[in-house]
């Protein structure tokens, strides 16, 4: 009974999603930026707006933005005028973010921005593609267990069995594409779990991680509003595509 109560306390499957987004921006110019995050795409709902002042060549960010997982979303970034080039406004638009891709940062970005990325993370103790499975990692470690990527309870990596005392045989799961063979309990009262392949989230899926995941990476679009027939604005627009300086940063 005690073991059942302990398992029940650290592993609960619920229908609600728990996670947040962090957006980071960088520019060579001083900019006043408005960031808008909304659920859905064609008829956005639950909009949230944030104001951000960017200093030249410094990274600014908005963090702890609550998001609803399992649904597409929309990120809009509007910046103030860049008078030097007669640019009135530039809008970055990224649609259909999904938790299959936890970090979004394209290789290139559009001036006046020199860096743009956003990262999506589950809240503490929440797991799964939609952050909708609860498993207390800290408590799991106290009983020599771990929470799997999908939010189920299992043995520490490399072990399985009723007491997690047996080494995982090298050829047990036949995982492909960097997948790991780990133990997983099907429910809170299970005594002996099964061995499954834990795939690279957002990259591969399937029983053996043999299938490449669907490409959920959203397209980032830029729209420039400038003085009509401005030669400077045209030059700016034609040379506005630059390397994204935040593309290779680690997640927060």
From Swiss-Prot:
Q: Which domain of life is it from?
A: Eukaryota
Question: Which cellular components does GO assign to this protein?
Answer: extracellular region; plasma membrane
* Location(s) in or outside the cell: Secreted
InterPro entries assigned: DSL, EGF-like_dom, Lag2
Listed as disulfide-bonded, the cysteine pairs are: 122-131, 135-147, 155-164, 173-181, 175-197, 199-209
Name it.
Answer: Delta-like protein dsl-1
Which is one Pfam family of this protein?
Answer: DSL
Gene Ontology biological process terms from the UniProt entry: cell fate specification; Notch signaling pathway
> What is this protein's gene name?
dsl-1
